[in-house]
From Swiss-Prot:
<keyword id="KW-0472">Membrane</keyword>
<feature type="region of interest" description="Disordered">
    <location>
        <begin position="137"/>
        <end position="169"/>
    </location>
</feature>
<feature type="transmembrane region" description="Helical">
    <location>
        <begin position="97"/>
        <end position="117"/>
    </location>
</feature>
<keyword id="KW-1133">Transmembrane helix</keyword>
<keyword id="KW-0812">Transmembrane</keyword>
<protein>
    <recommendedName>
        <fullName>Uncharacterized protein F59B10.3</fullName>
    </recommendedName>
</protein>
<dbReference type="GO" id="GO:0016020">
    <property type="term" value="C:membrane"/>
</dbReference>
<feature type="compositionally biased region" description="Basic and acidic residues">
    <location>
        <begin position="160"/>
        <end position="169"/>
    </location>
</feature>
Length: 169
């Protein structure tokens, strides 16, 4: 019979270590997991004054839950209030900007249609004018005259003005 070298060992058990004060076993639940009974109070946060500490009571308990909410938004009965602040304050400004943009686009489209209509009308009138003159074999347009390429020499005298105009000092 062969003995295994592992037969002589026993299951080792380790005694639990000493619990320190900060290692206490407590179950901490998130603030959202409590059933709130309502807003008990609110106060300015001492660490960051741009926040409120909203104090809510826990249903069927004497405990309270503190939730931090922005000061601009505030505390409501069931938690931090919804962020509708910009809707209330700037909603009309956004609406005016949208209306202005729509009016600019409509005005541009109307201007473009009128410009294209006038352009086509001008082209049609020009075509009719040329056709009318071709039918009469007459050109009412002035004939282009050659432009002079040289000027009389006396116009471009490079002599000083006192010599040319008999100017005396």
């Amino acid at each position: 019979m062969s003995n295994s070298r592992w037969d002589g060992y026993q299951q080792a058990t380790q005694a639990p270590g000493l619990n320190r004060q900060f290692d206490t076993q407590t179950n901490v639940l998130a603030a959202d997991s409590f059933v709130r009974s309502g807003l008990v109070g609110q106060q300015v946060n001492t660490i960051d004054p741009s926040f409120y500490d909203c104090i809510y009571g826990v249903a069927n308990s004497a405990n309270t839950v503190i939730e931090r909410c922005y000061k601009d938004i505030g505390c409501c009965a069931d938690g931090c209030c919804k962020n509708g602040y910009w809707h209330n304050r700037y909603g009309w400004a956004v609406a005016l900007i949208v209306i202005f943009c729509i009016l600019v686009i409509v005005a541009f489209v109307i201007w473009l249609v009128v410009w294209l209509f006038n352009r086509s009308k001008d082209k049609q009138q020009k075509r009719e004018l040329y056709e009318h003159y071709e039918e009469n074999n007459y050109s009412g347009l002035p004939t282009p005259q050659p432009t002079p390429t040289h000027y009389p020499a006396e116009q471009y005298s490079y002599d000083p003005a006192r010599d040319r105009d008999n100017y005396r000092y």
